[in-house]
Structures are given as C-alpha cells and as structure tokens.
Amino acid sequence: MKAVQMQMALETHATGVRDSSRDEFIAARLAKSPTGEDRLMESICERDNMLKALQRVESNKGAPGVDRMKTTQLRGYVRRHWDKIKCDLLHGTHKPLPVRRKEIPKEGGGVRLLGIPTVLDRLIQQAMAQILTALWDHTFSEFSYGFRPGRSAQMAIEQARQYVEAGYTYVVDIDLSKFFDRVHHDRLMQRLAMRIQDKRVLKLIRTYLNSGILTGDIIEQVTEGTPQGGPLSPLLANIVLDELDKELEKRGLHFVRYADDVAIYVRTPKAAERVKRSVSRFITDRLKLKVNEEKSEINRPWIGKYLGFRITRFMGRTRTGVHDKSIAHLKRQVRAITSRNRGRSMSTLISELNSLLRGWAGYFSPGLNATLADKLDHWVRRRLRAYLWNQWRLPRTRISNLIARGTTHHWAVMVGNTRKGPWRLSNNGTLCAAWPDQWFTLSCGLVCLLSFC
C-alpha cells in the first residue's frame, strides 16, 4: 500500500514539474517575442494547450450550463466544430452564452452564488487561464496562496504559523463582502491591459464578464463581478487582489491571502486597530470593493479561524490545529450520510464516508493529531453501529444478529429487547464487542483517520 501511495505521489510531483516547466517556457517565450503578447490568442488556440484544457474540464466534470451539454459530450462536439470555434476565437467573434445561476449553501448560513458556464465556454476559459497564468503568476506576491500552481491552503497556514511563532500574535481578518460579485470591471480590464496587448483576448474577457446570468427564464445583465464557477474567475480574482498584496508588502505588513481570505498579523492590539482601519479604507477607496465590517475582526490566532485551522501556542511551541467549527462541520456531514432513514447498504455508506474522510484528512493533515483522529474514528464507528442497530427493527432480528457475532444468548436477548435508542446503545459494551471499531476497518474497509497522522 505504501509503495502504491509513494508511486502516486511521485507521479503527481512529476506531472507538477512538467506543468510548471511548460508554463515557465510559455511565459519566457511570450516575454522574449516582440509579437508574442499581441498573438496571445494563437497561443491559447494551440493544440497542446487546448488538449490540456479539454482533459482538465473533463476530469472536473461539473454541472451543465444553459445549453445542457455535459462534459462527456464536449470532446465529440469540439472534434466536429473545432474549425469554427478556432476561427471565431482568432477573429474575435466568439459569443459566450450566459452563465447558469446556482446557489450553494454556506457553512455559516446564507448561500454562495455560482455562475456555471457552458462546457464549451469552460474549455475556452480553461485554455485562456493556462496561458494567462503563465504570463501573470510569477508577478504575484509570495504571500498569495489561493488558486496558484504549486501553492495550497496548507502552505498559507504554515506561513501564518511562522508569523505567530515570531511574535505576531494578533490577527486582522479582512472579510470582503461578496467579492466575486463586486469586482469592478473597468479596473480589472485596466489591470489586464497592463500585460496583455492582444485586443482579441481583452475583448473576449470583457465579453465573458458581461455575458449575463440566466435565473429561471430571465437573463440578467451584469455590470460588475466575475461569477464563481468559471475556470478564469480565480485568476481574475488574483489579478484584482494583487494590488492589495503589493500595498501590504509596501507597508511592510505580515500577511497571507488565500483567494479573498486576507489575514494580517501584528504584534499589538493598537497596531491591529490601525491596520484594520487603513487597509479597509484602501480596499474601499482604491479597489472599489466593500469590506464586511461585521465579519472583519481582530482576534488571537488560537481563537479565530483561518481556512478552517487555528494556531495554538503552548509551552513555548506554536502548532497548527483543526478549528472546532471545522470538526463540527465534518460531524454534520457524517450525520447526513449515516442518517437513520436513508436505508442504504453498509457498503454504500462506507464508500461515501471514505470519500469524505479522505478529503477531510488530506486537507487538515497539518492540524490533525493522534488524539483528535482517534476520537473522530471512534465517533464515526459509533454512528455506524447506531445505523446498523436501527436497520434491525424487530427484536428477533437484533437478537439473531448479536448471536451471529458471538454474543451469548442471555445478553443477546437482554440487549435485543431493550427500549433504549440506537445512539445510546451504540456505546453499549455488548454492541461494541459484537462490532468493535476495528471491525469496520478490517472487514468493511472504512478509512481510519489515525493513519493520516
């Protein structure tokens, strides 16, 4: 197993190196060629770039756009219509369709509004993002970590931990209110025009920004914002907020930014208040964005949450931990999967739980310790015992299943006829002996969080 995991890690690393080298090559070629930047659309339409974009869109899957075309249909469509698609792009006549509005519930309440482009527009945006990332990424701040090649939320948290370890123990969390919906189009286009000379690319980006949103049967015209859901949106967001990064660097502030999540670390409460006021003013006046004053706050790293983590200091050591709210969110997801009235087989439940737990542990591995992992492992298995018990509604079924697992007839009858609820019984000694924690791992294949520590 370890050999397979190591091979996968090596393959992923090798792929990342190849992609990074290719991007650096493209950036160098465009920078050195006197006509490179005004022929950017030709680079976007190159076969290798388009094939890479197609593979990315297919692997990401995702919901259809307004034309209802699925990602599984995209390759055949592009093969049949590529000559026209390429001609429209090179002549600046491609007309994107409106994005489809989709609401995603937020963890803290409310909804996040997504704009789902058609799969063809996703392909074109992905091809553009690959070339523009090569052109822009090397200019971004080293303290920007979101949606960038070779960077991650875990790296952002490690940088934050280093700040706290160095004595910057007050954090200013700046919350940008509905950032993706309020990006100023003219300011964004001005920023893009500083590095992009190809008017066709600029025109296409402007067309995407103004393509509209289909809500029900009505197309809403938009004059600001870059809808979340398209491959180009994260890069455009980084281009907008790079101006904030440069301002914070110029002031000598210690910060990390992941997409629109900005955290600034200072030494004193007085400095925190001053920084919060001045940075909020810059965001409002210069970037034409809105700061959510209610959610923007000054806190201690071990109290506040950043990207789902918290940073603690104990006995002279600074550590990264999983925030309580992130643990609570995981438990809500597990409860939804193991809800008593779902009527799913144990193998189906295990498959769903494994997908959830692997993703969660992979993300939170920097803050996951053995004590927390062991507690969560036990809690998940207790949920499964309660689920099993609830499926056997008749006492005789419960008794026969207990006996089949080696329980004596006396205790099988005692427990099988009890009126105690499934959750209370799930920690009962008889049930724990019949279906111990390790049974779910060894016999059912349930992921063990402790293995990630």
Locations of regions flagged by a protein language model:
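Conserved polymerase palm-domain catalytic core
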Residues: 88-103, 107, 131, 139-305
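Short, solvent-exposed helix-loop connector elements
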Residues: 221-225, 319, 335-349, 359-372, ...
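Amphipathic alpha-helical blocks
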Residues: 73-96
